[in-house]
Amino acid sequence: MRARNAGNVGTVPVRPYTIVSCAISVDGYLDDASPDRLILSGPEDLDEVDELRARADAILVGAGTVRADNPRLLIRDERRVAARVAAGRPPHPRRVTLTASGQLDAAARVFAGPGTPLVYATAAAGPSARKNLRESAVVIDAGAELSLAAVLEDLYSERLVATLLVEGGSRILRDLLAAGLVDELRLAIAPFFVGDERAPRFALPARYPHDESDPMTLVSVRRVGGVAVHHYRLGERFKLRQVPS
Protein backbone atom coordinates (compact mmCIF):
# COMPACT_ATOMS: atom_id res chain seq x y z
CA MET A 1 0.00 0.00 0.00
CA ARG A 2 1.22 3.49 -0.83
CA ALA A 3 -0.56 6.67 0.20
CA ARG A 4 -1.19 9.20 -2.57
CA ASN A 5 -2.81 12.04 -0.66
CA ALA A 6 -3.99 11.05 2.79
CA GLY A 7 -3.47 14.40 4.52
CA ASN A 8 -5.92 17.26 4.67
CA VAL A 9 -3.91 20.15 3.27
CA GLY A 10 -4.51 21.58 -0.19
CA THR A 11 -6.74 18.94 -1.78
CA VAL A 12 -9.46 16.56 -0.70
CA PRO A 13 -7.71 13.63 1.02
CA VAL A 14 -8.12 10.06 -0.14
CA ARG A 15 -9.05 8.73 3.27
CA PRO A 16 -12.07 8.37 5.54
CA TYR A 17 -13.47 11.17 7.63
CA THR A 18 -11.56 10.31 10.82
CA ILE A 19 -12.78 10.81 14.38
CA VAL A 20 -10.63 10.15 17.44
CA SER A 21 -12.59 9.42 20.61
CA CYS A 22 -10.98 8.60 23.93
CA ALA A 23 -11.33 9.10 27.67
CA ILE A 24 -8.46 10.36 29.81
CA SER A 25 -7.73 11.33 33.39
CA VAL A 26 -7.38 15.01 34.17
CA ASP A 27 -3.58 14.59 33.96
CA GLY A 28 -3.77 13.00 30.52
CA TYR A 29 -3.59 9.25 31.10
CA LEU A 30 -5.56 6.69 29.09
CA ASP A 31 -5.28 4.04 31.79
CA ASP A 32 -3.29 3.22 34.90
CA ALA A 33 -0.46 0.69 35.18
CA SER A 34 -2.48 -2.03 36.92
CA PRO A 35 -3.56 -5.26 35.19
CA ASP A 36 -7.20 -4.18 35.40
CA ARG A 37 -8.69 -1.64 33.04
CA LEU A 38 -9.23 1.80 34.59
CA ILE A 39 -12.81 3.06 34.25
CA LEU A 40 -12.59 6.65 33.05
CA SER A 41 -16.14 7.37 31.95
CA GLY A 42 -19.72 6.56 32.88
CA PRO A 43 -22.84 5.30 31.12
CA GLU A 44 -23.83 8.68 29.68
CA ASP A 45 -20.46 9.14 27.98
CA LEU A 46 -20.40 5.52 26.79
CA ASP A 47 -23.82 6.03 25.22
CA GLU A 48 -22.51 8.99 23.21
CA VAL A 49 -19.55 6.90 22.07
CA ASP A 50 -22.02 4.18 21.08
CA GLU A 51 -23.77 6.73 18.88
CA LEU A 52 -20.44 7.59 17.24
CA ARG A 53 -19.89 3.88 16.62
CA ALA A 54 -23.32 3.64 15.03
CA ARG A 55 -22.42 6.41 12.58
CA ALA A 56 -19.04 4.93 11.66
CA ASP A 57 -18.23 2.47 8.90
CA ALA A 58 -15.24 1.08 10.81
CA ILE A 59 -13.62 1.25 14.26
CA LEU A 60 -9.83 1.10 14.56
CA VAL A 61 -7.64 0.21 17.54
CA GLY A 62 -4.07 -0.95 17.88
CA ALA A 63 -3.01 -4.48 18.74
CA GLY A 64 -1.85 -3.26 22.15
CA THR A 65 -5.39 -2.14 22.93
CA VAL A 66 -6.73 -5.52 21.82
CA ARG A 67 -4.30 -7.29 24.16
CA ALA A 68 -4.75 -4.91 27.12
CA ASP A 69 -8.50 -4.17 27.02
CA ASN A 70 -9.94 -7.06 24.98
CA PRO A 71 -12.66 -4.81 23.47
CA ARG A 72 -15.61 -6.06 21.43
CA LEU A 73 -15.92 -2.85 19.34
CA LEU A 74 -19.63 -3.48 18.74
CA ILE A 75 -22.65 -1.19 19.00
CA ARG A 76 -24.35 -1.76 22.35
CA ASP A 77 -27.79 -0.28 21.72
CA GLU A 78 -29.94 -2.68 19.69
CA ARG A 79 -32.05 0.22 18.43
CA ARG A 80 -28.97 1.67 16.75
CA VAL A 81 -28.15 -1.73 15.29
CA ALA A 82 -31.69 -1.99 13.92
CA ALA A 83 -31.49 1.52 12.45
CA ARG A 84 -28.29 0.61 10.58
CA VAL A 85 -29.88 -2.55 9.18
CA ALA A 86 -33.00 -0.63 8.14
CA ALA A 87 -30.75 1.81 6.27
CA GLY A 88 -29.10 -1.05 4.37
CA ARG A 89 -25.87 -0.95 6.37
CA PRO A 90 -24.14 -3.81 8.21
CA PRO A 91 -25.35 -4.23 11.82
CA HIS A 92 -21.96 -3.14 13.20
CA PRO A 93 -18.97 -1.18 11.88
CA ARG A 94 -16.01 -3.09 10.48
CA ARG A 95 -13.44 -3.81 13.19
CA VAL A 96 -9.86 -2.90 12.29
CA THR A 97 -6.56 -3.35 14.10
CA LEU A 98 -2.89 -2.80 13.32
CA THR A 99 0.06 -4.95 14.32
CA ALA A 100 3.82 -4.79 13.90
CA SER A 101 4.40 -8.08 15.73
CA GLY A 102 1.57 -10.37 14.64
CA GLN A 103 1.00 -11.32 18.28
CA LEU A 104 -2.78 -11.44 18.32
CA ASP A 105 -5.00 -14.08 19.89
CA ALA A 106 -7.85 -15.45 17.78
CA ALA A 107 -9.83 -15.85 21.02
CA ALA A 108 -9.85 -12.08 21.61
CA ARG A 109 -13.37 -10.65 21.66
CA VAL A 110 -12.70 -8.34 18.72
CA PHE A 111 -12.45 -11.42 16.48
CA ALA A 112 -15.58 -13.10 17.86
CA GLY A 113 -18.26 -10.65 16.73
CA PRO A 114 -20.26 -10.56 13.51
CA GLY A 115 -18.42 -9.84 10.28
CA THR A 116 -14.75 -10.38 9.53
CA PRO A 117 -12.27 -7.94 11.11
CA LEU A 118 -9.36 -6.45 9.17
CA VAL A 119 -5.80 -6.70 10.48
CA TYR A 120 -3.12 -4.54 8.85
CA ALA A 121 0.26 -6.13 9.52
CA THR A 122 3.80 -5.27 8.55
CA ALA A 123 5.41 -7.62 6.05
CA ALA A 124 7.45 -9.15 8.87
CA ALA A 125 4.40 -9.63 11.11
CA GLY A 126 2.04 -10.93 8.44
CA PRO A 127 2.99 -14.63 8.65
CA SER A 128 2.61 -14.67 12.45
CA ALA A 129 -0.70 -12.83 12.27
CA ARG A 130 -2.08 -15.25 9.67
CA LYS A 131 -0.89 -18.26 11.67
CA ASN A 132 -2.40 -16.93 14.92
CA LEU A 133 -5.69 -15.71 13.49
CA ARG A 134 -6.35 -18.23 10.69
CA GLU A 135 -9.95 -17.61 9.60
CA SER A 136 -10.73 -15.09 12.35
CA ALA A 137 -9.66 -12.03 10.34
CA VAL A 138 -8.47 -10.81 6.97
CA VAL A 139 -4.76 -10.00 7.31
CA ILE A 140 -3.58 -7.27 4.93
CA ASP A 141 0.08 -6.72 4.09
CA ALA A 142 0.87 -3.12 5.06
CA GLY A 143 4.47 -3.14 3.81
CA ALA A 144 7.79 -2.97 5.61
CA GLU A 145 6.52 -0.28 7.97
CA LEU A 146 2.96 0.47 8.97
CA SER A 147 2.02 3.72 7.25
CA LEU A 148 -1.17 5.05 8.77
CA ALA A 149 -1.74 7.23 5.72
CA ALA A 150 -1.61 4.14 3.50
CA VAL A 151 -3.87 2.18 5.85
CA LEU A 152 -6.47 4.96 5.81
CA GLU A 153 -6.27 5.22 2.03
CA ASP A 154 -6.80 1.46 1.71
CA LEU A 155 -9.77 1.61 4.07
CA TYR A 156 -11.31 4.39 2.00
CA SER A 157 -10.53 3.17 -1.51
CA GLU A 158 -10.67 -0.61 -1.14
CA ARG A 159 -12.93 -1.22 1.89
CA LEU A 160 -15.35 1.67 1.23
CA VAL A 161 -14.93 3.13 4.72
CA ALA A 162 -16.20 6.71 4.56
CA THR A 163 -16.20 7.40 8.32
CA LEU A 164 -13.59 5.92 10.66
CA LEU A 165 -13.73 5.99 14.46
CA VAL A 166 -10.37 5.55 16.22
CA GLU A 167 -10.42 4.51 19.90
CA GLY A 168 -6.73 3.83 20.70
CA GLY A 169 -4.06 3.13 21.68
CA SER A 170 -1.60 5.83 22.62
CA ARG A 171 0.91 5.36 19.79
CA ILE A 172 -1.75 5.21 17.11
CA LEU A 173 -3.41 8.34 18.51
CA ARG A 174 -0.05 10.13 18.52
CA ASP A 175 0.84 9.07 14.99
CA LEU A 176 -2.54 9.98 13.51
CA LEU A 177 -2.66 13.37 15.21
CA ALA A 178 0.98 14.17 14.40
CA ALA A 179 0.43 13.25 10.73
CA GLY A 180 -2.62 15.49 10.41
CA LEU A 181 -4.90 12.54 9.64
CA VAL A 182 -7.68 13.42 12.11
CA ASP A 183 -10.71 15.59 11.37
CA GLU A 184 -12.43 15.53 14.74
CA LEU A 185 -11.31 14.89 18.33
CA ARG A 186 -13.68 13.95 21.15
CA LEU A 187 -11.95 13.94 24.51
CA ALA A 188 -13.78 12.84 27.67
CA ILE A 189 -11.88 14.04 30.75
CA ALA A 190 -12.44 12.22 34.05
CA PRO A 191 -12.22 14.32 37.26
CA PHE A 192 -9.30 12.48 38.84
CA PHE A 193 -5.54 11.99 38.52
CA VAL A 194 -3.53 8.87 37.68
CA GLY A 195 -0.06 10.27 38.32
CA ASP A 196 1.86 7.14 37.27
CA GLU A 197 4.57 7.56 34.63
CA ARG A 198 4.30 3.85 33.80
CA ALA A 199 0.73 4.31 32.58
CA PRO A 200 -0.14 5.04 28.92
CA ARG A 201 -0.63 8.71 28.08
CA PHE A 202 -2.93 10.32 25.55
CA ALA A 203 -0.46 12.69 23.89
CA LEU A 204 2.97 11.10 23.58
CA PRO A 205 5.85 13.38 22.55
CA ALA A 206 5.71 14.29 18.86
CA ARG A 207 5.69 17.24 16.47
CA TYR A 208 1.98 17.96 16.19
CA PRO A 209 0.65 20.22 13.42
CA HIS A 210 -1.74 21.99 15.79
CA ASP A 211 0.65 23.93 18.03
CA GLU A 212 0.19 27.41 19.49
CA SER A 213 0.51 28.96 16.02
CA ASP A 214 -2.29 26.84 14.55
CA PRO A 215 -4.49 25.54 17.35
CA MET A 216 -7.42 23.21 16.99
CA THR A 217 -10.88 24.79 17.01
CA LEU A 218 -12.78 24.15 20.23
CA VAL A 219 -16.35 23.38 19.19
CA SER A 220 -17.89 22.65 22.58
CA VAL A 221 -17.29 21.68 26.20
CA ARG A 222 -20.12 19.76 27.85
CA ARG A 223 -20.75 17.94 31.09
CA VAL A 224 -21.78 14.37 30.24
CA GLY A 225 -22.49 12.47 33.43
CA GLY A 226 -19.36 12.74 35.53
CA VAL A 227 -16.93 13.73 32.76
CA ALA A 228 -16.22 16.87 30.75
CA VAL A 229 -16.37 16.23 27.00
CA HIS A 230 -14.19 18.51 24.87
CA HIS A 231 -14.95 18.51 21.16
CA TYR A 232 -12.38 19.84 18.67
CA ARG A 233 -12.27 20.48 14.94
CA LEU A 234 -8.90 19.76 13.34
CA GLY A 235 -9.55 20.44 9.67
CA GLU A 236 -11.90 21.81 7.04
CA ARG A 237 -13.74 18.49 6.68
CA PHE A 238 -15.36 18.83 10.11
CA LYS A 239 -19.02 17.77 10.22
CA LEU A 240 -21.03 19.74 12.75
CA ARG A 241 -23.69 17.02 12.81
CA GLN A 242 -21.24 14.87 14.78
CA VAL A 243 -21.84 17.00 17.88
CA PRO A 244 -24.57 15.40 20.03
CA SER A 245 -27.40 17.73 20.97
Which stretches of residues belong to each language-model region?
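Enzymes that bind and transform nitrogen-containing heteroaromatic metabolites
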Residues: 1-245
